[in-house]
């Protein structure tokens, strides 16, 4: 559980005190005797205590950060709501946009991964003296290489397992 902000804790305590003082005033009002002097003084004292507690609450509440300081609301969402539209629709459209962008990025990642493997295979077949360097680069970029000769290097086990580690 996240730690509670000390200012927030003070405000919570002040609210509890206000509720307690309101209860005390309620008790004094329900037992009020217009002819009796002690009840009038006690009620006045409880109202003054309530006033001080409310003042303390107001002072401590001024030190709290604004809610938007922690979680800013996107300006397009504010405009969307001000134009009388449903924020749930905005959220759904935003989620769909993010999903499409993620699919596009994933497609690019797969295309580059496949290009890396094809390029490595072609470089190994055309420049066999660079095979160790090519395998080192493919391994460093998340690909799997098979130490075999010719066209099979870069396919086989590595080609089948790409969907697991490269995503």
Swiss-Prot record:
Task: Show the GO MF annotations.
Answer: transcription coregulator activity
UniProt feature, compositional bias: Gly residues? 141-158
Q: Where in the cell is it found?
A: Nucleus
Q: Does the keyword Transcription apply?
A: yes
Q: Which GO terms describe its cellular component?
A: mediator complex
Alphabetical UniProt keywords: Activator, Nucleus, Transcription, Transcription regulation
InterPro entries linked to this entry = Mediator_Med10 (IPR019145)
Extract one GO BP annotation from the record.
regulation of transcription by RNA polymerase II
Region Disordered: what ranges? 141-167
Summarize subunit and interaction data from the UniProt record for this chain.
Component of the Mediator complex.
The UniProt entry's sequence similarity note says: Belongs to the Mediator complex subunit 10 family.
Annotated function: Component of the Mediator complex, a coactivator involved in the regulated transcription of nearly all RNA polymerase II-dependent genes. Mediator functions as a bridge to convey information from gene-specific regulatory proteins to the basal RNA polymerase II transcription machinery. Mediator is recruited to promoters by direct interactions with regulatory proteins and serves as a scaffold for the assembly of a functional preinitiation complex with RNA polymerase II and the general transcription factors.
Please give the name of this protein. Mediator of RNA polymerase II transcription subunit 10
Protein's organism? Chaetomium globosum (strain ATCC 6205 / CBS 148.51 / DSM 1962 / NBRC 6347 / NRRL 1970)
Gene name as annotated: NUT2
């Amino acid at each position: 559980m996240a730690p509670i902000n000390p200012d927030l804790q003070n405000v919570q305590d002040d609210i509890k005190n206000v509720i307690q003082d309101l209860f005390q005033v309620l008790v004094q009002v329900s037992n009020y005797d217009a002819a009796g002097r002690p009840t009038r003084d006690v009620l006045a004292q409880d109202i003054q205590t309530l006033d001080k507690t409310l003042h303390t609450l107001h002072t401590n509440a001024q030190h709290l950060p604004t809610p938007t300081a922690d979680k800013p609301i996107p300006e397009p969402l504010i405009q969307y709501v001000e134009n009388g539209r449903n924020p749930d629709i905005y959220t759904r459209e935003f989620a769909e946009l993010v999903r499409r962008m993620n699919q596009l990025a994933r497609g690019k990642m797969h295309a580059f991964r496949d290009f890396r493997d094809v390029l490595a295979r072609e470089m190994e077949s055309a420049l066999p003296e660079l095979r160790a360097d090519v395998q080192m680069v493919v391994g460093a970029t998340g690909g799997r290489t098979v130490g075999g000769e010719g066209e099979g290097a870069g396919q086989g086990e590595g080609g089948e397992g790409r969907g697991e580690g490269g995503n």
